[in-house]
């Protein structure tokens, strides 16, 4: 077990570091309590809104924030992260919930948890850092656009029997449904969104989510007095408990232990075929969860001066996503906005995230009847604000203005693919394209430079600068071959060649074979890695054709 869970992968790392290695005092608990309550106030409406956006009833978002929030806080590797349902998952979870129902979504969440633990055990935590900013910005902006589009129906109260799955068809259907706008829903949505936008400018430390929802409810009261009809959580969502009792809105009880694949009234059947069908979505959830949770941890490190444990965080995220489905929780990861609010509110340890989850549980037990009165247009306004923040429009504009053309192409491609297809295709294509463009950029840096030295006319002395890898070597040796006419000796100085890969080695060997008769290649100042690569390949000096020297002086000794 110790070999599997090393110090870099072991769960509970953040909790141990924050509360065991550092003295946990009453003063620190007070700060965590205040931070936990602050974040809990933000999390309650967001968790419900994100569950609705994911195609399931709002209580499942609360179950996620409660159960996954506690498990990940205690077992993860980032002491300030607050986990729960996040906006990034909406575009993945909604199609799964529509096709397979809640049970299929819970099974996919469980599978994603297994993937996350495997990523942590394989120490993939630091590999996430190699995903280019242009890729992450492209797909997060694309997700923001998609989420924003998905909220227009509820925000305006449009009457739509069916919402198409493809983005362009969805936009067309929304446009055609505009004549069915519900003025009451639209008024509530606009007021709620307006308060969310302008609240931060007031300088009040209380998060704007609660005042915005209260204002939306006040407008709903006016609409009802005027005889209008407004869609609420209670009017749109119904539940059936295990004992057969039914109700509207949100059940006033704790999350119940269930088998994710065996829910009451579910048509989902757990088979190898169903698991195989869910695996791509589960892997997408795991990839997105890993990226978002580790990006969140990096942001928090910058805010607090601490250092997260990337692989421990992946293991903690995996445990949370494995345990949560047994209590009705959907996919969870660290939420950047809630985690940043946690830090700003004075959090000192993962205990603040636990307190935030406890507050969510108390809301389930005490406030469920009141939460059922929340208007759906106000929930949509919350998600529109989340979508705007997630799009990071200011960063997109900055990249368009100042970044190299290659990065702009990658970002726009990732954004478009995320909107038109899905995140997995966007990230896969984006990483491949970014890698190819990066290799082209590096290949252009590999070149031949003249060495100023007094030698006979039939001797050529050049310095190779840059890595000799597959994308650069062929062009470099082709250039060198064009300079060989009338040369008896060619001296190549390799002191600026840090890397020689298999492609570079192959190009080098073919160049040696193509050397004109009577021309000798002398290689000197070879660095360790290229020297080791040639030694492993069995490259040997060839009298009169190929020779190796420790330095340029030795290579020129007999000229």
Swiss-Prot record:
On assembly, the entry states: Interacts via the C-terminal cytoplasmic STAS domain with acyl-carrier protein (ACP), an essential component of the fatty acid biosynthesis (FAB) pathway. It also copurifies with proteins involved in fatty acid metabolism.
Q: What does this protein do?
A: Responsible for the aerobic transport of succinate from the periplasm to the cytoplasm at acidic pH. Can transport other C4-dicarboxylic acids such as aspartate and fumarate. May also play a role in the regulation of C4-dicarboxylic acid metabolism at pH 7, via regulation of expression and/or activity of DctA. May act as a co-sensor of DcuS.
Q: Where are the transmembrane segments?
A: 33-53, 55-75, 102-122, 127-147, 178-198, 213-233, 279-299, 314-334, 351-371, 373-393, 419-439
Pfam families for this protein: STAS, Sulfate_transp
Lineage at the top is: Bacteria, Pseudomonadati, Pseudomonadota, Gammaproteobacteria, Enterobacterales
The Gene Ontology biological process terms listed for this entry are: aspartate transmembrane transport; fumarate transport; succinate transmembrane transport
What this protein is called in its record is C4-dicarboxylic acid transporter DauA
Q: What is the protein's membrane topology class?
A: Multi-pass membrane protein
